[in-house]
Regions:
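Glycine-centered, phosphate/nucleic-acid-interacting loop/turn motifs that mediate DNA/RNA or nucleotide
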Residues: 76
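Short coil turns linking two alpha-helices in DNA-binding domains
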Residues: 61-62
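A short acidic, leucine-rich amphipathic alpha-helix
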Residues: 53-56
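Amphipathic alpha-helical dimerization/coiled-coil segments
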Residues: 98-144
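Short helix-capping/hinge SLiMs at alpha-helix to coil transitions
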Residues: 27-28, 42-47
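N-terminal leader segment of winged-helix/HTH proteins
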Residues: 1-28
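Short, cationic-aromatic polyanion-contact patches
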Residues: 28, 33, 83-104
Length: 180
């Protein structure tokens, strides 16, 4: 087993993580530590770090980091991994899932189903009362229909960027995934 050296974050890296924390708190109502963690994981070296290393780098408690990891895992944005012989998990950004990239249609399928449930309740109501649910259903179904095409467009665009040298090779896998 070999030790992994983790660099102390620079002021600029911590500022970036703080900016991510504010963005995710303001935009998505998440606890600032969730955004700070995601921002830091986007720039840290190595790309995967333990809960303790992340807590030390972000000057946060281990329990706050563990809670933020749980939130980001539920969103499909991070993944825990453990190298052979290690006793602790390492956390890194995971861009391998459709959900992490924003192309998972299930969120919108569930929204459409919920809106249709509301429409069934309001089956005899005037169109004005049903308007919000009708538009909600239409928008969700429209997104479900388009997401597969947008995902293919993104994959083609990403490959073009890689071919042009504007994106490095495969950035979708974590360090431990690459080692497998």
């Amino acid at each position: 087993m070999h030790a992994i050296v983790v660099a102390v974050p620079t002021d600029a890296e911590i500022t970036f993580a703080d900016h991510a924390g504010r963005l995710y708190a303001r935009r998505y109502g998440m606890a600032p530590v969730v955004g700070r963690l995601l921002g830091y994981l986007a720039i840290c070296d190595p790309r995967e770090q333990s809960i303790a290393e992340l807590a030390e780098a972000l000057l946060a408690s281990r329990s706050a980091i563990a809670g933020a990891v749980k939130t980001l895992e539920q969103l499909g944005l991070v993944r825990r991994s453990r190298a052979a012989g290690e006793r602790m998990d390492r956390v890194g950004i995971d861009l391998t899932s459709r959900r992490a990239l924003g192309f998972d249609p299930t969120e919108y399928q569930e929204q459409a189903a919920l809106a249709r449930e509301g429409l069934a309740i309001l089956a005899d109501a005037p169109p004005e009362r049903r308007a919000v649910l009708l538009e909600w259903t239409a928008m969700a179904e429209w997104l479900v229909a388009r997401l597969p095409e947008w995902e293919k467009d993104w994959q083609a665009h990403r490959e073009a960027l890689r071919a042009a040298g504007e994106l490095p090779g495969d950035t979708t896998h974590s360090d431990s995934e690459e080692a497998r």
